A protein has these predicted regions:
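Short, charged/polar connector segments at secondary-structure boundaries
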Residues: 1-131
Length: 131
């Protein structure tokens, strides 16, 4: 598996993407700006996005010219279609250990950071803390 840089103008969003991701793009852009582009966009052999539509929108908000991509050339068309859905759905199955999360956020709160975890979607009501 090789990570390649692809010009964002060459990437094609999947026309039937069932995910509504406009609300997440700004938070993902803030994450990319703060931590770097750590999760490549998955594309097929025709540069159509398999997974990573939100990351593409975030890259556009940041005016990036290119993004890291992985070509899923080891998957059949059927597997790509299934992976496109599975990749989004499986993350919804995870839950937060609220005690551990509060501890992590509390430790971050004690550090001198140039950002706030609310930049990445955390709500004070979700965690009961100062973020």
């Amino acid at each position: 598996m090789e990570i390649i840089e692809v010009n964002i103008k060459d990437l094609k969003p999947y026309e039937n993407n069932p995910r509504n991701n406009d609300d997440a793009a700004a938070a993902v852009a803030r994450s990319i700006k703060e931590f770097g582009f750590k999760v490549p966009i998955i594309i097929d052999e025709h540069n159509t996005i398999v997974a990573g539509h939100t990351r593409l929108k975030a890259a556009m908000l940041l005016n990036l010219e290119s993004v890291p991509c992985i070509v899923a050339d080891d998957l059949s068309e059927e597997q790509i279609k299934a992976f496109r859905l599975a990749d989004n759905k499986v993350s919804e199955l995870a839950t937060w250990d609220m005690e551990a999360l509060e501890k992590e956020l509390s430790e971050l709160d004690d550090m001198d950071l140039d950002f706030n975890m609310s930049d990445f979607g955390f709500e004070p009501s979700e965690i009961g803390g100062g973020y």
